């Protein structure tokens, strides 16, 4: 199956398909998590995680020597891409199979203007764009999750674990003793954790009276971090909270909700709707717009 040929006009409509073609899936398997894309994790509609990248990175990945080398192997099922025209064909193919979602990156003020949304320092907030534009700096996100190659192994281990628990009465005595020692060790660690939490709380209460600044033992113990980071640093002094000054009122930005549908003869692109971490597919038309560099 070859990639569709886009018309020569600036805007054109592409009908999407609910059934994904093997060629499109093979291309996405190559592109997904490709280092050339430099893809990052963002928040779609300030809720769901989505991997996104710029269109120019997609062009570079498809025109790279690595892609040409992988394409020569018939097992990979990749179609040849020689120039920007071929890149556009692949791009249209991915849009048709609902594997790409055009996105718009929001600024801090735009996120704050939406009721219920909160800016995230680590993950930028994104929303669906009206059109899929072939512009180098336009953002696109993946509507695809690469299948886990170890899923069968995990399933087998889970079944083996269930049978091992069921057959516990038939275990030899040395295995039963080993499980007992392990369980006692785990309970000891849990008891030590609670004891540490109680001791640090007592020290903190005493420091409120005895010292000018409150003292914390293991200040990151209950923070959202790794096990080792929870015990680093060993101690810290709590800094007093700064009083917030009066801020000037910023003009409110008008928020306009996006609608998927046709307007003045153009059909807007949103890709698949994502809600509560799930995606739904359906047949609809897509408007693609080329921008001359």
Swiss-Prot record:
Domain of life: Eukaryota
Gene Ontology terms: biological process: post-translational protein targeting to membrane, translocation
An example Gene Ontology molecular-function term: protein transmembrane transporter activity
Biased composition (Basic and acidic residues): 251-260
Record Pfam families: Sec62 (PF03839)
Keywords recorded for this protein, A-Z: Endoplasmic reticulum, Membrane, Protein transport, Translocation, Transmembrane, Transmembrane helix, Transport
Primary subcellular site in the record, as a coarse category: endoplasmic reticulum
Topology feature Cytoplasmic, residues: 1-150, 207-293
Function: Required for preprotein translocation.
Subunit structure: Part of a complex that contains SEC61, SEC62, SEC63, SEC66 and SEC72.
Record protein name field: Translocation protein SEC62
Organism (species): Candida albicans (strain SC5314 / ATCC MYA-2876) (Yeast)
Species classification: Eukaryota, Fungi, Dikarya, Ascomycota, Saccharomycotina
Gene assigned in the entry: SEC62
């Amino acid at each position: 199956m070859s990639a569709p040929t886009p018309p020569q006009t600036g805007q054109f409509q592409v009908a999407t398909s609910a059934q994904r073609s093997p060629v499109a899936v093979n291309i996405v398997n190559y592109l997904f998590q490709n280092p050339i894309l430099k893809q990052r994790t963002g928040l779609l509609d300030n809720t769901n995680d989505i991997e996104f990248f710029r269109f120019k990175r997609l062009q570079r990945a498809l025109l790279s020597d690595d892609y040409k080398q992988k394409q020569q192997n018939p097992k990979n099922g990749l179609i040849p891409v020689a120039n920007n025209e071929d890149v556009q064909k692949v791009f249209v193919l991915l849009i048709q199979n609902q594997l790409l979602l055009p996105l718009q990156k929001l600024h801090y003020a735009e996120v704050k203007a939406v009721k219920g949304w909160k800016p995230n320092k680590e993950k930028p907030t994104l929303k669906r764009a009206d059109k899929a534009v072939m512009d180098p700096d336009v953002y696109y996100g993946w509507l695809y999750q690469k299948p886990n190659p170890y899923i069968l192994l995990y399933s087998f281990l889970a079944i083996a674990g269930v049978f091992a628990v069921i057959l516990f009465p038939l275990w030899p005595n040395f295995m039963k003793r080993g499980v007992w020692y392990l369980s006692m060790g785990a309970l000891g660690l849990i008891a030590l954790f609670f004891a540490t939490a109680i001791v640090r709380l007592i020290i903190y209460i005493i420091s409120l009276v005895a010292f000018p600044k409150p003292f914390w033992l293991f200040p990151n113990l209950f923070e959202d971090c790794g096990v080792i980071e929870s015990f680093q640093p060993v101690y810290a002094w709590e800094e007093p909270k700064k009083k917030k000054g009066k801020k000037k009122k910023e003009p409110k930005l008008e928020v306009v909700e996006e609608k998927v549908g046709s307007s003045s003869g153009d059909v807007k692109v949103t890709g698949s709707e994502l809600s509560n971490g799930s995606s739904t597919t359906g047949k609809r038309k897509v408007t693609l717009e080329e921008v001359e560099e």
